[in-house]
């Protein structure tokens, strides 16, 4: 686990990241897709890009056309460049207090246990050699940091802000049509039946799996492989994303629940994620 931090620092240089954020010149029309990691960011990027381009797939990496603000400097991208279509769109995993202000924002929340397990599956084979770190060890170590929970509570007070679209991952899985309609309305894209069907198709698991080379962080992976990671490492972002199918021990789940009680409950008033999303009108309303 100590080696993991050293490896990841080769891809996520804090100095370059801070410089990238400082250089970003936001516009009021910009859309920043800002969930915590493994909470539907890539999926939402694809929905957004499909809507604004009516189905463009002429890109090698979704984060080239909807760039990740924090890594733009290390990847040599001009974060302030014009994009293929309007509105401009960006990815970020920053908490609300750190994200550049003056834009529109899409935040997606997801069950912290599912998100934590998905993070392990994503890291295994890319940043972690398979078999060297267990899911329990990885998730428990990260649970102690409380990063998911602090990100969650930073966005929660802004869930009803006019310039924030606050979505629930589990509701997206259950009703993608409603999700697409809400995103289209939020980014002010006229949505007819043809565009709705194209967007449903292009954001489906089968389509994104068929084109997974566009969603595997190719730019970031190539930079990592040039440093310390083995060639051919697996960084696919396209996973089924099933709800409640994590394989974690009771101790790990308990640790995540404790963090929720410590950090999230005092801010939201909800004792669990399940209780919180039950309060959110479904699907993706309210």
Set out the residue ranges of the language-model regions.
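PAPS-dependent sulfotransferase catalytic domain
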Residues: 1-167, 229-286
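Conserved ATP-dependent motor core of P-loop NTPases, especially the RecA-like helicase ATPase domain
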Residues: 198-199
């Amino acid at each position: 686990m100590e080696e993991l931090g050293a490896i990841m620092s080769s891809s996520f240089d804090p100095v370059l990241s801070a410089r990238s954020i400082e250089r970003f010149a936001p516009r009021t029309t910009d859309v920043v897709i800002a969930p915590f990691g493994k909470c539907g960011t890539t999926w939402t990027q694809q929905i957004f890009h499909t809507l604004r381009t009516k189905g463009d797939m002429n890109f090698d990496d979704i984060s080239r056309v909807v760039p990740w603000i924090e890594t733009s400097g290390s990847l040599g991208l001009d974060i302030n460049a014009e994009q293929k279509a309007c509105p401009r769109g960006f990815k970020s995993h920053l908490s609300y207090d750190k994200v550049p202000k003056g834009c529109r924002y899409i935040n997606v929340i997801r069950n912290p246990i599912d998100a934590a397990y998905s993070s392990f599956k994503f890291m295994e084979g890319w940043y972690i050699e398979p078999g060297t770190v267990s899911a329990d060890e990885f998730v428990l170590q990260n649970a102690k940091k409380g990063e998911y929970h602090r990100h969650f509570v930073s966005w929660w007070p802004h869930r009803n802000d006019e310039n924030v679209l606050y979505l629930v991952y589990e509701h997206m899985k259950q009703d993608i049509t409603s999700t697409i309609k809400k995103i289209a309305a939020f980014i002010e894209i006229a949505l007819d039946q043809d565009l709705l069907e194209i967007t449903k198709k292009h954001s489906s698991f089968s389509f994104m799996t068929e084109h997974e080379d566009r969603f595997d962080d190719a730019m970031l992976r190539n930079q990592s492989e040039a440093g310390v990671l083995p060639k051919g490492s697996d960084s696919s972002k396209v996973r089924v994303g099933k709800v409640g199918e994590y394989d974690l021990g009771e101790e790990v789940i308990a640790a995540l629940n404790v963090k929720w009680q410590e950090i999230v409950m005092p801010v939201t008033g909800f004792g669990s994620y399940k209780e919180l999303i039950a309060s959110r009108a479904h699907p993706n309303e309210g």
